[in-house]
Design a protein with these regions (language model features):
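Transmembrane helix-loop-helix hairpins at lipid-water interfaces of multipass membrane proteins
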Residues: 2-5, 54-112, 189-194, 294, ...
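Juxtamembrane helix-loop junctions of ABC transporter transmembrane domains
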Residues: 9, 14, 28-36, 59-60, ...
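Short intracellular "coupling" helices and adjacent cytoplasmic loop segments at the cytosolic face
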Residues: 24-31, 122, 130-154, 158-160, ...
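An intracellular "coupling" helix at the cytosolic face of ABC transporter transmembrane type-1 domains
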Residues: 44, 48, 52, 141-142, ...
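Transmembrane helices of ABC transporter permease
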Residues: 49, 53-66, 169-224, 296-309
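Helix-loop-helix
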Residues: 84-90, 187-201, 273-346, 351-352
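Cytoplasmic coupling helices
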Residues: 115-134, 148, 172-176, 199-241, ...
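ABC-type nucleotide-binding domain
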Residues: 368-641
Length: 641
């Protein structure tokens, strides 16, 4: 992940192969891609904090490239001394010691360059990942409902690493190779301009087929990324609790094995193909270097016999030639390298340029303190489209739904007084969940207003609004962490006594005490080590720890055993006591106790009142009661008897 292409001039054939391979593997289709204006300026601005260390990096690379041309001259001088009529032992020993010292310095420089490049490379990754993650956290919930999680993770991982690699590889490669090629050519022309020109004529024999192999290799590499992504996606879906449970319940392990081995086989096959093309590339470079070396020794040997050149000069020319072809080939791909860096950074900047829809207003202020009054004032609402949440420009982020957004709430007006419980009832798709999401300002309304204690929530500071409104969703989400950490998510500074009080209020303290690790018990992925009732009660405990003035609750529809149901009901009673509450009701006990019931149908409030009054009216609520609640009433009577 850090500047692996440095020091090609001094790296020998092995080092050249790796760097040139990376350059040839770049996809030259990037030359035709559109890059947003100003991307290059922003790219260098991202690297601005590392100007000092980058300066040291360039100095070290330059020094290494200069040192890289010394040893061939030393070895040539040693050969000349040995081939002379009066060889000098002292001279040979001295030159050998100098060559050894140069090798030690070169090794030390390479270690220093690696450290510097790693510091810059990993620093860039850290900075970009942190900024992208922080920015994605600010995006509205509509952004997450319309995009695939894997695509977002790819932006955070692959694109960020790709941008860093393209930038650091390109910088190190261009600087190192340019210096190496310049110095090597100067020395070679000084030693023998005729042999140097002949050697350069051979270069196209390698470059032309190498470019074709490189293009094919870039296509194969891109295909391998896609196939690997498919295989990884299969593992991701099957290795989580839900996926594994589904496979077992439907008895499909053999089919899953066959499907996975098929994908893994494709990964294997394309890996072999990729390795062979890479080998062809390296073989072509090695063959060209060998042919050129043969020419140097042949032509130079003849000139040495004729007395036009010394034997050591021929040896030095052959050594320089090996160091020349790799950097020249890499420099021929500079345009692709630069465009790859720009395209990679542009994809990262696309995410950073997404404007969050839900932000603090310029005049944002805290929610007025005290018991909370909720007011929905002629609210109309439709969910935002993909374009409105700024996904249209992200071509690689799969948009799950591109259809036009139809209105879902019409002229919704109601008031909840301090301490009151209002139940939302209605058929599926009536708008109950939408109302529950508008109050904590997960979305903004198109017209009308929502007020808490007289303040329009669009003018409330988000931190204050979040502290005022507590939400318990139908499927309570728990992180793969300890019970303690999941609870402290609501209030990081809570004491053990406060945690115990919250657990007791949620009717789950006894269960936690029976666990071997108590509060430090890890709940598993999404809390799968806990039962449905236990997850609900932990979510309620988390709410109690937060202690909001307003509670928004979406009751779970899952059927619980009578003991768990009773515990959940007691926990809910504790959570709602003394708080202004808005509840999507699925339990008969909730609608019976509600101060007001709002009956929704197709986004409108069609009935409102108390349980007994609405039943007597014989409208939609009475019909829903017969469908949804009457069975619960019968069960309650049966249990009582």
């Amino acid at each position: 992940m850090s500047m692996p292409g440095h020091g090609m001039g001094a790296g020998g054939p092995g080092g050249q192969f790796g760097s040139v391979m990376r350059s040839m593997r770049r996809d030259d289709s990037v030359k035709g891609q559109h890059v947003t204006r100003g991307t290059a300026r922003r790219m260098f601005r991202f690297a601005r904090p590392y100007r000092g260390i980058l300066t040291w990096f360039l100095v070290l690379v330059t020094v290494e490239a200069v040192i890289g041309i010394i040893n061939p001259l030393l070895f040539g001088s040693i050969v000349n001394s040995l081939a002379s009529s009066h060889p000098s032992k002292q001279l040979v020993i001295t030159l050998s010691l100098v060559a050894g010292a140069v090798a030690v310095v070169d090794t030390a420089l390479s270690i220093g360059i690696r450290y510097v490049s790693a510091s810059v490379g990993e620093g860039l990754i850290y900075d970009m990942r942190s900024q992208v993650f922080e920015h994605i956290q600010k995006m509205p919930i509509a952004f997450f409902t319309r995009t695939q999680t894997g695509a977002l993770i790819s932006r955070l991982n692959n694109d960020v690493i790709g941008a860093q690699q393209a930038f650091t590889d390109t910088l190190s490669s261009v600087v190192s190779n340019l210096i190496s090629v310049t110095l090597v050519l100067v020395v070679m022309f000084a030693l023998s301009w005729q042999i140097t020109l002949i050697s350069l004529v051979i270069l196209p024999i390698f470059v032309i087929p190498a470019k074709r192999v490189g293009r094919r290799l870039s296509v194969i590499t891109r295909e391998s990324y896609g196939i690997n992504a498919e295989m990884n996606n299969t593992m991701n879906e099957r290795f989580n609790v839900s996926g594994a449970l589904l496979v077992k319940l439907f008895g499909r392990p053999e089919e899953e094995r066959d499907a996975f081995t098929s994908k893994a086989g494709r990964v294997r096959d394309i890996g072999v193909t990729q390795a062979m093309y890479a080998r062809f590339f390296i073989a072509a470079l090695s063959l060209t270097a060998a042919l050129a070396t043969a020419v140097v020794y042949g032509w130079g040997g003849v000139q040495a016999i004729d007395g036009a050149l010394r034997v050591g000069t021929v040896v030095a020319l052959a050594a320089y030639l090996v160091r020349l072809y790799g950097p020249l080939t890499a420099l021929s791909n500079v345009q692709i390298d630069v465009m790859t860096a720009l395209v990679s950074f542009d994809r990262v900047f696309e995410v950073l340029d997404l404007p969050p829809m839900i932000v603090d207003a310029d005049d944002a202020r805290p929610v007025p303190p005290g018991p909370a009054t909720i007011e929905f004032d002629h609210v109309d609402f439709r969910y935002p489209t993909a374009e409105e949440v700024s996904l249209a420009s992200l071509e690689s982020v799969a948009v799950l739904d591109t259809t036009a957004s139809a209105p879902v709430l019409f002229d919704v007006t109601f008031t909840v007084q301090p301490g009151q419980l209002v139940a939302l009832v209605g058929p599926s798709g009536a708008g109950k969940t939408t109302i529950s999401q508008l109050l904590p300002r997960l979305y903004d309304v198109q017209s009308g207003a929502i007020r808490i204690n007289g303040l329009d929530i669009r003018h409330a500071a988000l931190s204050s609004l979040t502290a005022t409104v507590g939400v318990v969703t139908q499927d309570a989400h728990l992180f793969h962490d300890s019970i303690r950490s999941n609870l402290l998510y609501a209030r990081p500074g809570a004491t053990v006594a406060e945690l115990d009080a919250a657990l007791a209020g949620a009717q789950i303290a006894t269960m936690v005490d029976t666990l071997p690790d108590g509060l430090d018990t890890v709940v598993g992925d999404r809390g799968y080590r806990l039962s449905g009732g236990e997850k609900q009660r932990l979510a309620i405990a988390r709410l109690l720890l937060k202690a909001p003035e307003i509670v928004v609750l979406d009751e779970a529809t899952a059927h619980l055993d009578s003991e768990s149901e009773a515990a959940v009901q007691l926990a809910l009673a504790t959570a709602l006591e003394g708080r202004t509450s808005l509840v999507i009701a699925h339990r008969l006990s909730t609608v019976r106790e509600a101060d007001q019931i709002l009956v929704l149908d197709h986004g409108r409030i069609v009935e409102r009142g108390r349980h007994e009054d609405l039943l007597a009216d014989g409208g939609l609520y009475a019909e829903l009661y017969r469908i949804q609640f009457e069975g619960q009433d019968a069960e309650r009577v049966e249990e009582a008897s």
